[in-house]
Each structure stands twice: as structure tokens, then as C-alpha cells.
């Protein structure tokens, strides 16, 4: 299976990165390939809402930034993983900008040939709250709606709360993340 990962966190060695690494280690142990994009290191501008990408004979987004490096891996992947710390009950800004730019691709199942149809979507998320109180329900609902609209299958969220303990102090959470990755 081909896995495309959009990592929106600002810290390459932070809690979200550690949780994601365990999921990906598990996936790689089963022979899955991974392409990881560290969005904070890329020049990805927000969607301008210009609608140029939806005009007849349009060829994607008119903004020629680093998002062009992501479009083809998105087309080719079987699983898309969005990885982010929770910021104000949402994705971190760089990841939200990239997801908004999906608009330039054929995405609406039933209305056009969705490049997302048949793919799977997973969220890997950390927050400063205990996992049972992290408030992710609203974000999960948005991603579930995105799956319905695009023809993707929602796999759920791998999450960890880090309010009182870093992930290094929660080996059981990291073991579970590895097992989830190995089960993909």
C-alpha cells in the first residue's frame, strides 16, 4: 500500500512527530511505502478562492508553489494520513492550507471523477489535553464529511493527550500507535 503523509506540525521531533513515527514504523513493518511531506518546510500558500481551477480546460491550481509536489503523490496513494497537533480544535495552519488546496483537484464523488475515491483517510493527532477530553469530535466530523463527499473511507484517529506526560512517558500509547500502523 502507498501511504501519503501530510505532516502539519511545527516540531519534527515533537509529540505529533513521535506518534506519527510509530504509526509509520508499524506500516513499514508490513511492507507499505510511505511518502512524508513536512509542510512547515514547504511554500504552500492558502487557497485564493479564485475558482480558476474549476474553469473549463483548467489544469489545477494557478498558484505554482510547493503544493505541485504533493498533487501526484495524492493521486497515487492508497491511504492519506493527516498528522497535526490540535490547534484551536482544528488542524495546524500549514496542514489546513494544504487540505484547502485539494479543491484544485477533481474531488467530488459522483459529480466528477474524484481522485480520492477508493482511498482511505486517517488522522494522527496530539493535543495538550487528555485524549478523552481533547475535543477532536468536531474535527473528526469535518473529516468524515470530507470522506463522504470525496468517496474516501474514514479510518479514524490515532490520538494522544500530552497535558501531563510527554509521549516518551506513555509507552503504551506508542505501542498502540505501532500496532495500528502494522494493522493497516
Task: Enumerate the language-model features and the residues they cover.
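Beta-strand-loop-alpha "switch" segments that mediate conformational coupling across diverse proteins
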Residues: 156-160
Amino acid at each position: 500500500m502507498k501511504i501519503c503523509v501530510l505532516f502539519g506540525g511545527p516540531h519534527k521531533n515533537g509529540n505529533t512527530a513521535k506518534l506519527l513515527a510509530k504509526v509509520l514504523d508499524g506500516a513499514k513493518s508490513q511492507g507499505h511505502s510511505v511518502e512524508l511531506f513536512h509542510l512547515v518546510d514547504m511554500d504552500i500558500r492558502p487557497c485564493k478562492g479564485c475558482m480558476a481551477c474549476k474553469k473549463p480546460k483548467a489544469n489545477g491550481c494557478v498558484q505554482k508553489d510547493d503544493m505541485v509536489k504533493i498533487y501526484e503523490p495524492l493521486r497515487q496513494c492508497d491511504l492519506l494520513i493527516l498528522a497535526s497537533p490540535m490547534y484551536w480544535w482544528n488542524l495546524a495552519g500549514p496542514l489546513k492550507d494544504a487540505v484547502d488546496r485539494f479543491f484544485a483537484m477533481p474531488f467530488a464523488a459522483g459529480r466528477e471523477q474524484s481522485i480520492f475515491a477508493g482511498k482511505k483517510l486517517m488522522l494522527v493527532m496530539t493535543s495538550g489535553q487528555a485524549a478523552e477530553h481533547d475535543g477532536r469530535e468536531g474535527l473528526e466530523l469535518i473529516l468524515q464529511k470530507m470522506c463522504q463527499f470525496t468517496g474516501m473511507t474514514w479510518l479514524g484517529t490515532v490520538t494522544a493527550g500530552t497535558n501531563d506526560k510527554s509521549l516518551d512517558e506513555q509507552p503504551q500509547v506508542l505501542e498502540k500507535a505501532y500496532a495500528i500502523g502494522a494493522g493497516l
